[in-house]
Amino acid sequence: MAFPLQKTFLCSNGQSFPCSNGRSTSTLLASDLKFQRLNKPFILRVGSMQIRNSPKEHPRVSSAAVLPPVPRSIHDIPNGDHILGFGANLAEDHPGYHDEEYKRRRSCIADLAKKHKIGEPIPEINYTTEEAHVWAEVLTKLSELYPSHACKEYLESFPLFNFSPNKIPQLEELSQILQHYTGWKIRPVAGLLHPRQFLNGLAFKTFHSTQYIRHTSNPMYTPEPDICHEILGHMPMLVHPEFADLAQVIGLASLGASDKEIWHLTKLYWYTVEFGTIEENKEVKAFGAGILSSFGELQHMKSSKPTFQKLDPFAQLPKMSYKDGFQNMYFLCQSFSDTTEKLRSYARTIHSGN
């Protein structure tokens, strides 16, 4: 994942059953959202409105300006020009803030991501023994909860990766697995991308992923996405065709969206891909990466403390919270196909101008 903060059964021969609408995720086209505007380059202006950053929970609207050009391919999306935080520059409350060696390590890994060119193999990271121990502890602890807490699609996909506590997977290997099943690719990133760039990447079936790992002082906690979150939270779900469609629909909706719409789409991503839950046989199971990559969040989700609501993409969504402890509320999906259709309906209002 690259900004703040989450089947059909996969056959043994490497093929996947089609989505419920009869199409594999590779045939999900931009035309589904009426993207005639993608046929030629252009710059969008939304009336005379501009959205400007604000310290408040949502952006502030002010007078005329031009939105960024709409990317026509993943090549048009910068990789690292707008890193919002973390990366090698850590906040004072970060576990690794006072560890100069850790910060230098993060900086080196971030530099590799910044230099990466699309089409080239993702740089391999030679993880240290300490980093490998962190990965092993996280994988071992989370694997204890997955059978009872994770959705069935996650459990079906998980074995495809052959995760081992003895080795941190490399992004290039994982990217090849995603390509094989759903046509998605991974692109390394130095830290938290601007939401517009991150969401735009999803439209082109590209997932921006960090490569650094959380600080060794607290293996079960990270204030930002790291390689453990990316691998254990996101990768198993992205080989599931219907979930991959869901993520891509959010990305397609972001192409040419105003800053205000980007903010709403960011929340939709947050409450589905990051912290989404789904009902299975009258039980709540996790499919969001922010839950699946957190031992404490998984336990909290199954406790009596949080509340659950149905997702309405058109409604005003609660403030995103990732530093105030666990989520107080989760959105509960009935199915991935149903949620995707709801998101697609919302996306049509963005691109029809309504």
From Swiss-Prot:
Highest taxon in the source lineage: Eukaryota
Location of the protein in the cell: Plastid, Chloroplast
Protein name: Phenylalanine 4-monooxygenase, chloroplastic
Keyword Heme: no
Catalyzed reactions: (6R)-L-erythro-5,6,7,8-tetrahydrobiopterin + L-phenylalanine + O2 = (4aS,6R)-4a-hydroxy-L-erythro-5,6,7,8-tetrahydrobiopterin + L-tyrosine
Coiled-coil parts of chain: none
Cofactors named for this entry: Fe(2+)
Main location: plastid
Pfam families per UniProt: Biopterin_H
Complex and partners: Forms monomers.
Keywords: Allosteric enzyme, Chloroplast, Iron, Metal-binding, Monooxygenase, Oxidoreductase, Phenylalanine catabolism, Plastid, Transit peptide
Signal peptide location: none
A GO term for molecular function: iron ion binding
Gene Ontology biological process terms from the UniProt entry: L-phenylalanine catabolic process
